[in-house]
């Protein structure tokens, strides 16, 4: 069927990766948030969700995840991004399903890294996992299950917050 029913709504299935990356960049746990979402064409789950808030260390975040940036327009813009904002800089990640861009803007340095969008890099994860099993040594480049569980939990919390803040349905 259409949508992300097995993995949950789009913001859980796809958006939880942005929730995870934002938490990793901030190096801290989420403290406050406010989410807003839009449903399209009366689909029951949102196609676009924006959530902003703070981490316990005062760092601010903005996560926008959606598949509706001019969905039917000739030239689409980006589809998803995160901003993690601190007093000494910003970490920004965005992609348009063709190119992934990471910008790190600090007090003394700015880095912009652009690479072809590579999906979820499952083959890299499998290789790292296989090496860990073969050697019996955990590869620190692998994500922790705990981090995935936390990202999933917060993605659901942000989605629930958006539901409480009204999710209009647009499109015909």
Annotate each PLM feature.
Residues 56, 128-172:
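C-terminal helix-rich "cap/oligomerization" subdomain common to oxidoreductases
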Residues 1-42:
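Predominantly a Rossmann-like dinucleotide-binding segment in NAD(P)-dependent oxidoreductases
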Residues 39-46, 54-127, 141:
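NAD(P)-dinucleotide binding in Rossmann-like oxidoreductases
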Residues 2-7, 110, 114, 137-140:
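Short amphipathic alpha-helical segments at helix-loop
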Residues 27-29, 68-77, 136-144, 161-162:
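Short, charged helix-to-loop "capping" segments that act as catalytic/coupling loops
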Residues 9-12, 16-23, 120-127, 146-153:
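A structural signal for well-ordered alpha-helical segments within the folded catalytic domains
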């Amino acid at each position: 069927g259409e949508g992300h029913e097995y993995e949950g709504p789009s913001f859980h299935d796809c958006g939880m990766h942005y929730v995870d990356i934002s938490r990793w960049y901030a190096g801290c746990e989420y403290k406050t948030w406010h989410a807003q979402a839009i449903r399209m064409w009366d689909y029951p789950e949102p196609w676009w969700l924006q959530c902003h808030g703070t981490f316990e260390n005062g760092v601010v975040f903005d996560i926008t995840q959606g598949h509706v940036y001019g969905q039917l327009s000739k030239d689409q813009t980006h589809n998803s991004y995160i901003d993690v904002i601190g007093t000494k800089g910003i970490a920004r990640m965005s992609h348009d399903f063709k190119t992934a861009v990471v910008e790190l803007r600090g007090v003394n340095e700015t880095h912009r890294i652009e690479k072809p969008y590579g999906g979820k890099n499952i083959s890299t994860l499998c290789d790292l996992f296989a090496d860990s099993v073969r050697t019996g040594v955990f590869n620190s480049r692998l994500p922790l299950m705990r981090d995935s569980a936390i990202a999933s939990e917060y993605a659901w919390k942000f989605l629930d917050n958006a539901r409480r803040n009204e999710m209009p349905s647009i499109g015909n």
